[in-house]
Amino acid sequence: MLGGLLVLCGCSPKSMPDSDLIGLKFVSSGTMARPEFEGSVRMDSAGVFVLKAMKENYGPMFEKQITAEDMKHFREIIEDEKMYKYKDSYRPRMQVMDGWGWSFWAKFADGSVIESHGSNARPDGNGLGKVHGYMEQLIQDGKQIEFPEE
């Protein structure tokens, strides 16, 4: 019965993709001009996963190759924290104009994509915090690729 209702309204239940995670991005921003934290993982032309992220808030970008096992760990976070159920957008009930926001994107080998963002509101759980924390942990021995102007 529920399945029939979902088909009629054009909705589909959100479920975890069955394929491997091949890309990931998390950005949080405050009231400053640049992101508070930014991290992304992409597969390069040689099939190697490359993490680009900040070691600290508002810091320069660093780069590091990561393993397929690291990508499996990110995938486990997404699954365990049910991040695949995130709404497209999160906003508070009352308008807040302080500029704080975040965005999350994950791509899987079968073409599935999870995308979500928010302004002054976020989903329940600690999925975003765990993704952020694991990116920071991995990038600590990365090579600096962005140099602030002095």
Feature locations, PLM:
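Short amphipathic beta-strand/extended segments with alternating polar/hydrophobic composition
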Residues: 38-42, 62-66, 111-122
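N-terminal post-signal-peptidase region of extra-cytosolic proteins
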Residues: 36, 59, 88-91
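Post-signal-peptide N-terminal segment of Sec-exported extracytoplasmic proteins
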Residues: 31-57
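Short, low-complexity, polar/charged sequence segments that are solvent-exposed and flexible
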Residues: 42-48, 60, 70-71, 123-126, ...
